[in-house]
């Protein structure tokens, strides 16, 4: 019996799309699927944290099938912890468990595919949907950046992988206690698993709506780098994990043979370089406890 935890901060423009995709998948799940009776067994909790909009009301409109919790305290990891505590308190500490960002839309068939992959054996396992970046409403520089980012091997294997989704079985969730108050929650979880225990599910796709403006892209990119610096202090990288080493070379070898990719590669490389500088500046200016939020992709 699966459970889903969705932290949501001012997601009024995306939470309905997120929930509708989950429930449509549940209703349409065929009876001969290995994950039978999905709708009857699915438990969803949405944690609306520090919201100034009607995220909670829109989630409640889906009825009793969605548990909605509200908290005035902001922070994604706090919201996730509150959601998991709520499940335990209600006797619904069920697995596999999907952690899903409130602005992510899973394509049909993705949820059953992830459940089947997460339940393939009793050993610890973490899986994620494959991200599909939607830059259709973004500026040209943002679109060029994501043309390059599509070649980043991080998004094509393992879990988490930048899709705003990851699912663990019970043995996998036992690898850590509560989520620490850090920015890079997904990388924290990733480091709890060996590379052989992490997988991107080929039959699952998550629509990731990217920033619309180049300014927003730079800010979010710096935030991610800032989170990585912070994480290294509390949870060093695994010895058996290559991490981001070699990413530049992989992307360069994939893009440079085709002259049509050159503008995208130049912009992608520039953003990756600048984000290092801006993340250090952000750390000096405001610390690492702020959940920066891209509003441009949510309108």
Feature-to-residue mapping (PLM):
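Short, well-formed alpha-helical segments that are part of the catalytic scaffolds
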Residues: 11-26
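Acidic helix N-cap motif at the loop->helix transition within catalytic regions
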Residues: 13-17, 53-61, 109
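A conserved acidic beta->alpha catalytic loop
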Residues: 21, 48-57, 73, 104
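Conserved donor nucleotide-binding strand/loop of the catalytic core
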Residues: 56-90
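Short beta-strand-to-loop acidic/aromatic patch adjacent to the donor-nucleotide binding site
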Residues: 92-105
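Conserved donor NDP-sugar-binding/catalytic core segment of glycosyltransferases
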Residues: 108-140
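Catalytic donor/gating beta->alpha subdomain of glycosyltransferases that bind UDP-sugars
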Residues: 118, 133-136, 180-242
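Terminal low-complexity segments of carbohydrate-biosynthetic enzymes
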Residues: 210-211, 219-299
């Amino acid at each position: 019996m699966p459970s889903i935890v969705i932290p949501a901060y001012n997601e009024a423009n995306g939470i309905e799309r997120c929930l509708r995709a989950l429930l449509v998948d549940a209703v349409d799940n065929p009876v001969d699927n290995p994950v039978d009776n999905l709708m009857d067994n699915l438990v969803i909790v949405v944690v609306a944290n520090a919201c100034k909009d009607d995220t909670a009301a829109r989630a409640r409109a889906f009825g009793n099938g969605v548990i909605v919790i509200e908290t005035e305290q902001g922070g994604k990891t706090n919201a996730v912890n509150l959601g998991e505590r709520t499940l335990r308190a209600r006797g619904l500490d069920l697995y596999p468990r999907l952690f899903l960002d409130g602005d992510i839309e899973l394509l049909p068939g993705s949820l059953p595919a992830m459940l089947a992959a997460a339940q393939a054996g009793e050993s610890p396992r973490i899986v994620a949907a494959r991200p599909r970046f939607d830059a259709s409403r973004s500026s040209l520089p943002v679109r060029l950046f994501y043309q390059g980012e599509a070649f980043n091997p991080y998004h094509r294997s393992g879990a988490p992988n930048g899709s705003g989704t990851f699912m663990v079985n019970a043995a996998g969730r036992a690898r850590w206690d509560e989520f620490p108050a850090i920015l890079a929650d997904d990388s924290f979880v990733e480091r709890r698993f060996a590379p052989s225990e992490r997988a991107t599910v080929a039959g699952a796709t998550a629509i990731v709506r990217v920033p619309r403006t180049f300014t927003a892209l730079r800010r979010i990119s710096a935030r991610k780098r800032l989170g990585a610096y912070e994480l290294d202090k509390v949870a060093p990288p695994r010895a058996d994990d290559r991490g981001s080493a070699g990413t530049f070379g992989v992307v360069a070898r994939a893009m440079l043979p085709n002259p049509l990719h050159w503008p995208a590669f130049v912009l992608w490389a520039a953003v990756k370089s600048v984000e290092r500088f801006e993340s250090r500046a952000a750390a000096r200016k405001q610390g690492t406890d702020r959940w920066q939020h891209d509003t441009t992709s949510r309108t």
